């Protein structure tokens, strides 16, 4: 009797495949709109295992507490200005409609009050391109270069997310990569299907390794692995598609 392949077991969602949420300090998001005003204080800088950037724990004057990504140069004890009237200084949380053009920002809200959706990875930032006060819209350029409009009543943090250059440092050891993957419940290492036994994968088995064949789109679950209904595969296929576009 065959077994369910690994992707089916992952899809079912067993405990060994779930991200360890009990290790998290808390969600990185702004307080509700009515609570984000006045001043806050950076109490602690934390390493969050499930995130790619340092996290700052901020306590407001009213005693409310929340987590936000740390800006480059942020330090413990720094005073954070929040809400309307805040100055464009690194680490301050401002209303998008009040941020000057050309300012670098991160953790940008798509809609007012959603807690932050854009530019949240280490070393990234968005740039304020312009304002549309008559439409309550702010034009920003994302790290990808895409230009979008967001709600001008939303919030963003001034500066660049700390931890830039993270991907430039090599892992050096497979063990470090293992622990990074384990913190996020990633599948590591990735084993090729044709290197497995026949009971574990449709491409497995044989006296020597052979490449798998494309699978029809009508194949049942468990058999549908590898390339699904592909017209061609390999480097030549990519080259041919590039020539067609030209």
Swiss-Prot record:
Gene3D superfamilies listed in its UniProt record: 2.30.30.30, Nucleic acid-binding proteins (2.40.50.140), Ribosomal protein L2, domain 3 (4.10.950.10)
An individual GO BP term: cytoplasmic translation
Subunit details: Part of the 50S ribosomal subunit. Forms a bridge to the 30S subunit in the 70S ribosome.
Source organism per UniProt: Pyrobaculum arsenaticum (strain DSM 13514 / JCM 11321 / PZ6)
Region of interest (Disordered), ranges: 196-226
UniProt keyword annotation of Magnesium present: no
Keywords (A to Z) from UniProt: Ribonucleoprotein, Ribosomal protein, RNA-binding, rRNA-binding
Domain of life: Archaea
Gene Ontology molecular function: rRNA binding; structural constituent of ribosome
Function: One of the primary rRNA binding proteins. Required for association of the 30S and 50S subunits to form the 70S ribosome, for tRNA binding and peptide bond formation. It has been suggested to have peptidyltransferase activity; this is somewhat controversial. Makes several contacts with the 16S rRNA in the 70S ribosome.
SUPFAM superfamilies: Nucleic acid-binding proteins, Translation proteins SH3-like domain
InterPro entries reported for this sequence: NA-bd_OB-fold (IPR012340), Rib_uL2_dom2 (IPR014722), Ribosomal_uL2 (IPR002171), Ribosomal_uL2_arc_euk (IPR023672), Ribosomal_uL2_C (IPR022669), Ribosomal_uL2_dom3 (IPR014726), Ribosomal_uL2_RNA-bd_dom (IPR022666), Translation_prot_SH3-like_sf (IPR008991)
Gene that encodes it: rpl2
UniProt-recorded name of the protein: Large ribosomal subunit protein uL2
GO CC field: cytosolic large ribosomal subunit
UniProt similarity note: Belongs to the universal ribosomal protein uL2 family.
